């Protein structure tokens, strides 16, 4: 009987389960503060599990990605689209930073006080702080959650192991798969954690706490829509000198729609390849560019990382300098490229960006937990942006005469 319940839960729709957790959490938070405090233990366990796995995930994900990917045989078109993917992701993260400055959001978090120590603001202080984090002992970086140190050692290790044997690379691929399975297991428990977090949030902060979540979600979705209809439109016009919107709407209708519901760029690869074929793009090109885009073209993830990191800074009262904002755009860009194929990957990389502002690791993980609460909508919109942009950029880089008469 018990095993059947577990199997039924494991096979259930995670979105539906999270929605049920949110509703039950609100009801418990309103009706009983005592039960909410008990339920909060589930939230604490969930965030603790995320805190434990996140450093290892970032390290092994980036190291494996660098040491196993090979673009040396790629032609000029592939090199162009790699550049376009990275530039598009950077512009998306820069838009997210600007959106936060114009429409800052502060979260209502239980037990979070205004920061007594602001982040460094002078250029010399910023680079000194970054330098010491970068050269941190790798074991200490993993244990303390120093994500800049983790990122540095992961990149260094990936480059050093670039030319190791295929057998050695396979070991890292297998370890990476093992870590991803652990992450998927933890994320599958998200409904219980979210139930506890929502119940405690409603009991402690009332409707004000939930309202801050809604404001954050609106900012995220609005920024992603701006990237879709303004930034991507400008990129297409720059490349083609033609009206970008017919192609954008084709990509939205035939790619973003499916990606919104699958919530997986990888699962949407066959849909995107079929669309590229209908558009008249060379199979030799889109056969490489579409899977590649599902790996490194992560504009939506960059928006999520940048906005949630700056929201964490706003919440604790840290003022962000222009230099820090620029550095965040760069960090969000490359962090987003490592978020593919991981359930909640963009959320788990938020502590990496938060480390730039000396934000306490516990606070960063509370923001990550809130990300899972709003992720029911945020992750769908993020994936729709990521996946549809793969086709959009492939089309303009292909130099083929495109077929716009697609039904």
From Swiss-Prot:
InterPro entries: Na-dicarboxylate_symporter, Na:dicarbo_symporter_sf, Ser_Thr_transp_SstT. It comes from the Bacteria. It is a multi-pass membrane protein. This is Serine/threonine transporter SstT. Involved in the import of serine and threonine into the cell, with the concomitant import of sodium (symport system). Pfam families: SDF. Its main location: membrane. It comes from Campylobacter jejuni subsp. jejuni serotype O:23/36 (strain 81-176). SUPFAM superfamilies: Proton glutamate symport protein (SSF118215). GO terms for molecular function: neutral L-amino acid:sodium symporter activity. Keywords: Amino-acid transport, Cell inner membrane, Cell membrane, Membrane, Symport, Transmembrane, Transmembrane helix, Transport. The chain crosses the membrane at residues 12-32, 42-62, 81-101, 141-161, 179-199, 218-238, 245-267, 288-308, 330-350. Belongs to the dicarboxylate/amino acid:cation symporter (DAACS) (TC 2.A.23) family. One of its GO terms (cellular component) is plasma membrane. PANTHER family: PROTON/GLUTAMATE-ASPARTATE SYMPORTER, SERINE_THREONINE TRANSPORTER SSTT. GO terms for biological process: serine transport; threonine transport. It is found in: Cell inner membrane. It catalyses: L-serine(in) + Na(+)(in) = L-serine(out) + Na(+)(out); L-threonine(in) + Na(+)(in) = L-threonine(out) + Na(+)(out). Signal peptide: none annotated. Gene3D superfamilies: Sodium:dicarboxylate symporter.
């Amino acid at each position: 009987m018990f095993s059947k319940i577990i199997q039924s839960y494991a096979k259930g729709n995670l979105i539906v389960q999270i929605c049920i957790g949110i509703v039950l959490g609100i009801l418990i938070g309103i009706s009983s503060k005592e039960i909410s405090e008990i339920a909060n233990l589930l939230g604490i366990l969930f965030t603790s599990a995320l805190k434990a796995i996140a450093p290892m995930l970032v390290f092994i994900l980036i190291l494996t990605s660098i040491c196993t990917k090979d673009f040396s045989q790629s032609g000029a078109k592939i090199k162009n689209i790699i550049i376009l993917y990275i530039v598009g992701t950077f512009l998306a993260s820069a838009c997210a930073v600007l959106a936060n400055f114009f429409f800052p959001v502060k979260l209502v978090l239980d037990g979070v006080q205004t920061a007594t120590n602001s982040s460094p603001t002078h250029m010399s202080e910023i680079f000194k702080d970054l330098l010491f984090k970068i050269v941190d002992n790798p074991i200490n970086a993993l244990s303390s959650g120093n994500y800049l140190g983790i990122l540095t050692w992961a990149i260094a290790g990936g480059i050093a192991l670039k030319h190791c044997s295929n057998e050695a690379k396979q070991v890292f691929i297998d370890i990476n798969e093992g870590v991803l399975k652990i992450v998927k297991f933890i994320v599958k428990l998200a409904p219980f954690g979210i139930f506890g977090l929502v119940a405690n949030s409603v009991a402690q902060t009332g409707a004000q706490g939930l309202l801050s979540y809604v404001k954050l979600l609106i900012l995220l979705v609005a920024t992603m829509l701006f990237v879709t209809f303004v930034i991507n439109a400008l990129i297409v016009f720059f490349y083609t000198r033609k009206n970008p919107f017919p192609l954008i709407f084709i990509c939205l209708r035939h790619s973003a729609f499916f990606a919104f519901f699958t919530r997986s760029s990888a699962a949407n690869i066959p849909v995107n390849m079929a669309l590229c074929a209908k558009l008249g793009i060379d199979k030799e090109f889109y056969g490489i560019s579409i899977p590649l885009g599902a790996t490194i073209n992560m504009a939506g993830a960059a928006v999520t990382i940048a906005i949630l990191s700056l929201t964490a800074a706003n919440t604790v009262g840290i003022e962000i300098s222009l230099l820090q904002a620029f550095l965040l755009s760069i960090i969000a860009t490359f962090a987003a490229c490592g978020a593919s194929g991981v359930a909640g990957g963009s959320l788990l990389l938020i502590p990496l960006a938060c480390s730039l502002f000396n934000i306490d690791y516990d606070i960063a993980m509370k923001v990550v937990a809130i990300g899972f609460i709003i992720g029911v909508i945020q992750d769908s919109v993020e994936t729709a942006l990521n996946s549809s942009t793969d086709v959009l950029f492939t089309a303009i880089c292909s130099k083929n005469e495109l077929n716009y008469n697609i039904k």
